[in-house]
Swiss-Prot record:
It is found in: Cytoplasm. It comes from Methylibium petroleiphilum (strain ATCC BAA-1232 / LMG 22953 / PM1). It catalyses: urea + 2 H2O + H(+) = hydrogencarbonate + 2 NH4(+). Transmembrane segments: none annotated. This is Urease subunit gamma. GO terms for cellular component: cytoplasm. Pfam families: Urease_gamma (PF00547). NCBIfam families: PRK13241.1 (NF009712), urease_gam (TIGR00193). GO terms for biological process: urea catabolic process. Keywords: Cytoplasm, Hydrolase. One of its GO terms (molecular function) is nickel cation binding. The keyword Transferase does not apply. Heterotrimer of UreA (gamma), UreB (beta) and UreC (alpha) subunits. Three heterotrimers associate to form the active enzyme. Belongs to the urease gamma subunit family.
Length: 100
């Protein structure tokens, strides 16, 4: 399998997000990398599904709450920027205060 660097990045994000989902399902609070991976994966998948940038900016704030993450993690992530591929090209999606 010959993957581009971008495809490798997406695969790494997916793997980290899958691990985060499993840990969250077991009742564990997520750390910084897990939280970022889960939100990023949700944005990438939403773009693939055809959602708009505005929809993804809003949806990115609904993925996790403070109760889902370890103490201090929400403050460590003031915003997340994801370069996602949409049907009409690649766009930058910025989610401000992603963990409410």
């Amino acid at each position: 399998m010959d993957l581009t660097p971008r495809e490798k990045d997406k695969l790494l994000i997916f793997t980290a997000a899958l691990l985060a989902e499993r840990r969250r399902a077991r009742g564990l609070k997520l750390n910084h990398p897990e939280a970022v991976a889960l939100i990023t994966a949700a944005i990438l998948e939403g773009a693939r599904d055809g959602q708009s940038v505005a929809q993804l900016m809003s949806a990115g704030q609904q993925v996790l709450t403070r109760a889902d993450v370890m103490d201090g993690v929400a403050e460590m992530i003031p915003d997340i920027q994801v370069e996602a591929t949409f049907p009409d090209g690649t766009k930058l999606v910025t989610v401000h205060q992603p963990i409410a």
